[in-house]
Amino acid sequence: MPIRVPDELPAVSFLRNENVFVMTSSRAKTQEIRPLKVLVLNLMPKKIETENQFLRLLSNSPLQIDIQLLRIDSRESKNTPAEHLNNFYCDFEDIQEQNFDGLIVTGAPLGLVDFCDVAYWPQIERIIAWAKDHVTSTLFVCWAVQAALNILYGIPKMTRETKLSGIYQHQTDKPLALLTRGFDETFLAPHSRYADFPVELLQQYTDLDILVSSEEAGAYLFASKDKRVAFVTGHPEYDVDTLAGEYQRDLAAGLNPQIPLNYFPNDDASLPPKASWRSHGHLLFANWLNYYVYQITPFDLRHMNPTLD
């Protein structure tokens, strides 16, 4: 889907250099169709980098997507210019009366922080509750999965002893599900987290459909039967060098990290890694947009679909 973004957003030139179709707001006004409204709650510190990653995955389809970037942390950012945040992000109070076709909640580097110590935890609770009445389908990614499972299902925070980092093999458990349509029987996907998502824990606490899992990484992709919420515990949006950057960052911080699994050639961090997960990342987001958002959402967002009640 050509994503519809402000003309001045840095992602426009960045993604066009990759031959990704980006439609600016000025051009979109000439097309007489209703774009899908997708809200992106960006919790990552390097917001511009994260914008580029998610907008790339949202861009590959003929329908328009009107992207609205959302922030909830009022503290001064160390990694993103204030001017960028002020120009391209809205506060929750600006949109709380609106309805959206989709909501994406990104990960956050909070794997070792208790929920009660997360500065914006009350805002997370508020937005997840708000989404039940104002969003057709919500996609949670990595840390946001752990937060949502706690808020929606009462699942306690599960933390691994060592960080799960690298490229892991996954098996498609339900190949006929809409969200996994077109998936290979096995495929690779990146993980970078302390959070633990055992399949047995999800089966104990929820009736969520577990669609993809990994012997090493646990549950990867699961969703509610009504398609209102979907969860991906890895990072299909990651650039080829994102894990390398995280590894070097942790080395510099003296954390003695393990080298990301199945990532650097011959486990040699001096060699450039190669991406092996992009196609399934694109397919996952395309399926979510099509089957969980576009096929269900009402044409007039002022009247949310009664099946969502």
Swiss-Prot record:
SUPFAM superfamilies: Class I glutamine amidotransferase-like. The record marks 192 as: Important for substrate specificity. Substrate binds at residues 163, 192, 249. The keyword RNA-binding does not apply. The record marks 111 as: Important for acyl-CoA specificity. It is found in: Cytoplasm. Its EC number is 2.3.1.46. It is an enzyme of class 2 (transferase). It catalyses: L-homoserine + succinyl-CoA = O-succinyl-L-homoserine + CoA. GO terms for cellular component: cytoplasm. The active site is at 142 (acyl-thioester intermediate), 235 (proton acceptor), 237. Pathway: Amino-acid biosynthesis; L-methionine biosynthesis via de novo pathway; O-succinyl-L-homoserine from L-homoserine: step 1/1. It comes from the Bacteria. One of its GO terms (molecular function) is homoserine O-acetyltransferase activity. Its main location: cytoplasm. One of its GO terms (biological process) is L-methionine biosynthetic process from homoserine via O-succinyl-L-homoserine and cystathionine. Keywords: Acyltransferase, Amino-acid biosynthesis, Cytoplasm, Methionine biosynthesis, Transferase. NCBIfam families: metA (TIGR01001). Transfers a succinyl group from succinyl-CoA to L-homoserine, forming succinyl-L-homoserine. Belongs to the MetA family. This is Homoserine O-succinyltransferase. It comes from Yersinia enterocolitica serotype O:8 / biotype 1B (strain NCTC 13174 / 8081). The gene is metAS.
